[in-house]
Amino acid sequence: MYKQQYFISGKVQGVGFRFFTEQVANNMKLKGFVKNLNDGRVEIVAFFNTKEQIKKFENLLKNGNRYSNIENIEKKTLDEKYPFQFNNFKIYY
């Protein structure tokens, strides 16, 4: 299993980006979460089964939804000891 963390900056809050991310992740059967951060970015943690899933997810994130404007995506690989497990993908408020 591959565990990735993303920090997305740009016009990503108040434009349905979290809902878009949740839809993409659920369609791909990913597990994890998406949430707004106080600094205006969005954080995503996602668990993938294959590297191909990672590439597809990242390509969809780069485009965002029609109301968002993605300026930057920071990516971090989480190690196997990441303390949280997820049964699905959800939005944290």
Curated annotation (Swiss-Prot):
Which Gene3D superfamilies does the record associate with it?
3.30.70.100
Reaction catalyzed? an acyl phosphate + H2O = a carboxylate + phosphate + H(+)
Reading the lineage from the top rank, the first entry is: Bacteria
Q: What class of enzyme is it?
A: hydrolase
Per the similarity annotation, which family is this?
A: Belongs to the acylphosphatase family.
The scientific name of the source species is: Borreliella afzelii (strain PKo) (Borrelia afzelii)
The name this protein goes by in its record: Acylphosphatase
Q: What is its EC number?
A: 3.6.1.7
Q: Which UniProt keywords apply?
A: Hydrolase, Plasmid
Acylphosphatase-like domain span: 3-93
| Catalytic residue positions | 18, 36
Q: Supply the NCBIfam families for this chain.
A: PRK14432.1 (NF011006)
What GO molecular function annotations does the UniProt record carry, in alphabetical order? acylphosphatase activity
